[in-house]
Curated annotation (Swiss-Prot):
Pathway stated in the Swiss-Prot or TrEMBL entry: Amino-sugar metabolism; 1,6-anhydro-N-acetylmuramate degradation; Cell wall biogenesis; peptidoglycan recycling
Protein family (similarity comment): Belongs to the anhydro-N-acetylmuramic acid kinase family.
Gene coding for it: anmK
Reaction catalysed by this enzyme: 1,6-anhydro-N-acetyl-beta-muramate + ATP + H2O = N-acetyl-D-muramate 6-phosphate + ADP + H(+)
Gene3D superfamilies: 3.30.420.40
Pfam family, one: AnmK
Domain of life: Bacteria
Known function: Catalyzes the specific phosphorylation of 1,6-anhydro-N-acetylmuramic acid (anhMurNAc) with the simultaneous cleavage of the 1,6-anhydro ring, generating MurNAc-6-P. Is required for the utilization of anhMurNAc either imported from the medium or derived from its own cell wall murein, and thus plays a role in cell wall recycling.
Binding site for ATP: G12, T13, S14, L15, D16, G17, V18, D19
GO biological process terms held by the UniProt record: 1,6-anhydro-N-acetyl-beta-muramic acid catabolic process; amino sugar metabolic process; peptidoglycan turnover
Protein name per the record: Anhydro-N-acetylmuramic acid kinase
């Protein structure tokens, strides 16, 4: 069974940077050693946003974007190696999620697409890469997402305490770690995605720092109720979603009914949308004693306060409080999934994704010996 140093690479739906994590992994433990966040050039970020909102590309443009993202991921890995004074031979493998540009797990031909050419990463780092983690689960009738609940269960489950792990990235997803029950998990809906999209369009800021805009505004209840009527929120699990659905166009369609509203009030309403949709799903899933939050949204104190207010009797905390960096959780998970793939172990949970069976995930891109 392969064990040793692994690197995880994650570029999520929030597009706030490439997260790279170094960890020692074996069958008994996952120990994080180092991490960094690598910036995504504005031009690449905009290109990804355009695809996710349905903008058409030529095959040449798509191929160039795939290559550019692969090079970006390789640069991020090499920066971490240099920082830690490590060589390619010191690393067993890289687990690279890739950049999701489309996720459509239902319909006649379900599919999901993550780009960032793994061949570029191997060629530029000299390290074996495991990538393309989601499509095997979809081929077996699953959603292909979320995959991280398996990792949450391995690290954070408790024999008697009802726990849930909430990742608030661009999309928010919930892992249900309830003693005596199969692990559950699904996407609750937008996390930071709509909040970030709104302030980017209105003020040119990548996110609402310290929730300043949201705190300065007031929740527009009719707008909130209008958004909450979206059928996704009442859809039963298993379910997953992404930027191809909850994007700026989705927000614009709802705002058409509310002309002339204060931008700060919209920001406050979007924060409340995230808090309400998450808390409703926690309660519908039977509630928990402890909700452990990770991802960028865990640093949004307004969001954390609203979750605590909407979930009385639940301890709302961060995964950092139990020793796992909330910023690095997903990258760490894909390092762990790479280890499982090389060990020939399944990486999905059918109780989460709806797949017909457990399966080894991913494709292996071997480095030259």
């Amino acid at each position: 069974m392969k064990s040793g140093r692994f690197i995880g690479v994650m570029s999520g739906t929030s597009l706030d940077g490439v997260d790279v994590v170094l960890a020692t992994i074996d069958e008994h433990r996952v120990a994080q050693l180092a991490s960094l966040s690598w910036p995504i050039p504005v031009s690449l970020k905009q290109a990804v946003l355009d695809i996710c909102q349905g903008q058409q590309l030529t095959l040449s443009q798509f191929g160039q974007l795939d290559t550019q993202l692969g090079r970006l991921f390789a640069d991020a890995v090499n920066a971490l190696l240099k920082e830690q004074n490590l060589q390619a031979r010191d690393i067993v493998a890289i687990g690279c999620h890739g950049q999701t540009v489309w996720h459509e797990p239902t319909g006649v031909a379900p599919h999901t697409l993550q780009i960032g050419d793994n061949n570029q990463i191997v060629a530029r780092t000299g390290i074996t890469v495991v990538g393309d983690f989601r499509r095997r689960d979809i081929a077996l009738g699953g959603q292909g997402a979320p995959l991280v609940p398996a990792f949450h269960h391995a690290l954070l489950a408790h024999p008697t305490e009802r726990r849930m792990v909430l990742n608030i990235g661009g999309i928010a997803n919930l892992s249900l770690l309830i003693p005596g029950q199969l692990v559950g998990g699904y996407d609750t809906g937008p996390g930071n995605m709509l909040m970030d999209a709104w302030i980017w369009r209105q003020a040119g800021k990548p996110y609402d720092k310290d929730a300043e805009w949201a705190r300065a505004g007031k929740v527009i209840l009719p707008l909130l109720q209008n958004m909450l009527s979206d059928p996704y929120f009442s859809q039963p699990a298993p379910k997953s979603t992404g930027r191809e659905y909850f994007n700026y166009g989705w927000l614009e369609r709802h705002l058409r009914h509310f002309p002339g509203v204060d931008p700060r009030d919209v920001q406050a309403t979007l924060a409340e949308l995230t808090a309400v949709t998450i808390s409703e799903q926690v309660l519908l899933s039977g509630g928990c004693e402890r909700l452990m939050v990770c991802g960028g949204g865990s640093r949004n104190l307004l969001l954390m306060a609203r979750l605590a207010a909407l979930l009385p009797g639940t301890e709302v905390t961060t995964t950092d409080a139990v020793g796992i960096s909330g910023d690095d959780m997903e990258a760490l998970a894909f390092a762990w999934l790479a280890w499982r793939t090389l060990a020939g172990l399944p990486g999905n949970l059918p109780s989460v994704t709806g797949a017909s069976q457990e399966t080894v995930l991913g494709a292996i891109f071997p480095a030259n010996p």
